[in-house]
């Protein structure tokens, strides 16, 4: 029992061709049969079936089904669901149970979505391969020796492997888009503030944004329409009205669409297979009426440096709360309070998390604040202005999601800088706070997925999703 889209599933459910319970049971059986893939951290067997039966009774009673009626979803394990574990794939939160629902979870429940479980991720969303997890790595659905990307690797692998129809992830610098590209699914990072962050464990608070992973743009739009919007519990959530994304998508046509092509996204170092697949799809889009406009984003080389200064600074502050005193893991080796703090954090955090905390503490220190943090904030403003200039003349910006295809498990773990470069094309949009997504466009010579990143203007997710649908459908002609 597999579905190409939520529309397909919804039609069958409402026509009573199948029950919610049968659909959820099929997904749970597939999840159980693939537990060795390490995709799910926890599976809500009883609760998911309870939800499904409740929805079947709702339909029997003639009640109006919600907008996401019966949608089987996976949730990244840094998003709070009351009464369930919230580990962030970290030992330091191994015994923590969430005490409230994130705003997005509450909104999804109100529209009848079904939660199958919590999925694996890089610890505290810090990573590009899903290898920085206390639960171990997740294999790529297309080659079990390769990574699925990160940090939302479990979310992407769940959708690609038909272990959820749609998944929620979080994107700080590419953590939805890069795994989407590696796993051949759509991955959307909306405009910063479009979706409430209340109930999401913070990594970089001025970057973090909940994202959506799905098989197609229409499903992402359906979920976005439900979870987007202002939230009084999140001061950074936008007051901009939530539009009808489906209607906005219908207004997008390839004919006359202006696509900006930044030369900086096609360096000589770009993997040749990735370059070939992306160029082939761009040529196809041109043949269907799209206009390719060369643009330049000259500050792109500074993106990784600025991003890792700013996000680690925020992380060093955000993660100070995990100290073993109030909740989570507590070391038993401590002789006094100071020892307890030090040992709990030393034993509870993984190596990459500790590396970023130390880097963030360093750049915020009195002697280096102006040299690093303040300078990086100035660079961030330059990025914002540069994207505004570029997007004033084009509808979207296109390029590769990642500079290389999925790499082998363990290949980059000993070289953090090489790992960070996996996000070299996704980080700039995060710095600027603008929406971006990855859409599948083909495979390399080894049969591994290649994703195309599309970047749009503030709050133009509808145009972005409409373009993604056109790009994806163009490959089916």
Curated annotation (Swiss-Prot):
One GO MF term: glutaminyl-tRNA synthase (glutamine-hydrolyzing) activity
Active site: 76 (charge relay system), 151 (charge relay system), 175 (acyl-ester intermediate)
Enzyme class: ligase
TM region positions: none
Catalyzed reactions: L-glutamyl-tRNA(Gln) + L-glutamine + ATP + H2O = L-glutaminyl-tRNA(Gln) + L-glutamate + ADP + phosphate + H(+)
Any one biological process term the GO annotation gives: translation
EC number: 6.3.5.7
One Pfam family linked to the record: Amidase
Gene3D superfamilies membership: Amidase signature (AS) domain
Translocase among keywords: no
Keywords linked to the UniProt accession: ATP-binding, Ligase, Nucleotide-binding, Protein biosynthesis
InterPro entries for this protein: Amidase, Amidase_CS, Amidase_dom, AS_sf, GatA
Record bears the keyword Ligase: yes
Origin superkingdom: Bacteria
GO cellular component: glutamyl-tRNA(Gln) amidotransferase complex
Assembly description: Heterotrimer of A, B and C subunits.
Annotated function: Allows the formation of correctly charged Gln-tRNA(Gln) through the transamidation of misacylated Glu-tRNA(Gln) in organisms which lack glutaminyl-tRNA synthetase. The reaction takes place in the presence of glutamine and ATP through an activated gamma-phospho-Glu-tRNA(Gln).
UniProt family annotation: Belongs to the amidase family. GatA subfamily.
The protein's name in its UniProt record: Glutamyl-tRNA(Gln) amidotransferase subunit A
Organism classification: Bacteria, Pseudomonadati, Chlorobiota, Chlorobiia, Chlorobiales
